[in-house]
Amino acid sequence: MTEADNGVLHTLFHSDQGGHEQVVLCQDRASGLKAVIAIHSTALGPALGGTRFYPYATEEEAVADVLNLSRGMSYKNAMAGLDHGGGKAVIIGDPEQIKSEDLLLAFGRFVASLGGRYVTACDVGTYVADMDVVARECRWTTGRSPENGGAGDSSVLTAFGVFQGMRASAEHLWGDPSLRGRKVGVAGVGKVGHHLVEHLLEDGADVVITDVREESVNRSTHKHPSVTAVADTEALIRTEGLDIYAPCALGGALDDDSVPVLTAKVVCGAANNQLAHPGVEKDLADRSILYAPDYVVNAGGVIQVADELRGFDFDRCKAKASKIFDTTLAIFARAKEDGIPPAAAADRIAEQRMSDAR
């Protein structure tokens, strides 16, 4: 066993505090595939979660990420009212360098070998066209194109759900769900953030954006000239008069550096795992910053892919995603009742649903 193998095993057995049911290490030498599939829980039903294609620095980092992400999917699916547990997959490597049809087909065979215990979908670095390829080897694939029996890109409903979470946050904090005149900062205007900006503008918000990809910023500012762009996330979170901060890129946006200087009164965004470490939710509460739990408000996408399994209906999905408004308000009420941060309140509600199902 190599030193790298030992590192992966150490991560699996000593860093897994979430009690995962199954972790599968996948390797196909012919295509260059290296992937990890993690099933956190099947208490509510088959594990459901996307496939992330990312150039992790080490295999240990990939394993740690998939454990964290799959656990988060259990909570997300529970809070979304879905009959699914939580799972996730990561493919290790730069998708722009190594993604190929053969690699995706090999990955599909690994997912298929689980016999339906895990259902995959798109995530960072994977797209509808990729799921169409995976589906050729695996029927437990969602996020496919409409012409291949799927629902297409889920970013539209994800953005809609985040918007509902923002409206609920505004209702809770200011007594009015309207965002008219509120200044909202969106960090990351890619697949989801771009659609979120449109909802915000339609509701009358003043929008400030940033993104590491200049082309994403240019797309938004070209389509919406009223949008203000700033250089980076640090500039965004320090924006004077910012009411709401929406992290919509990768996780860990709320950390020991960002929280102390954050000017917003609300955090509500599409990114997964926004809290960099345990305790950040308390830091936010200590600064009287209202945090809408990420896995609750960004559940629109998983609502869509779950619906795809029964024959996708957009109106049915949108109606379910609109309930994120009420769910978010219920979390804030539970947090106040129990004297805990909203993130802890959401966890308690999700854990109760999973416990009741066992």
UniProtKB/Swiss-Prot annotation:
Pfam family, any one: ELFV_dehydrog_N
Gene3D superfamilies: Leucine Dehydrogenase, chain A, domain 1, NAD(P)-binding Rossmann-like Domain
Catalytic activity: L-valine + NAD(+) + H2O = 3-methyl-2-oxobutanoate + NH4(+) + NADH + H(+)
Enzyme Commission (EC) number: 1.4.1.23
Domain of life from the UniProt record: Bacteria
UniProt keyword Zinc present: no
CDD domains: NAD_bind_Leu_Phe_Val_DH
A GO cellular component annotation in the UniProt record: cytoplasm
InterPro entries: Aminoacid_DH-like_N_sf, Glu/Leu/Phe/Val/Trp_DH, Glu/Leu/Phe/Val/Trp_DH_C, Glu/Leu/Phe/Val/Trp_DH_dimer, Glu/Leu/Phe/Val_DH_AS, Glu/Phe/Leu/Val/Trp_DH_bac/arc, NAD(P)-bd_dom_sf
Active site: K88
Subunit structure and binding partners: Homodimer.
Family the entry assigns: Belongs to the Glu/Leu/Phe/Val dehydrogenases family.
Name this protein carries in UniProt: Valine dehydrogenase
Protein species of origin: Streptomyces virginiae
Organism ancestry: Bacteria, Bacillati, Actinomycetota, Actinomycetes, Kitasatosporales
Gene: vdh
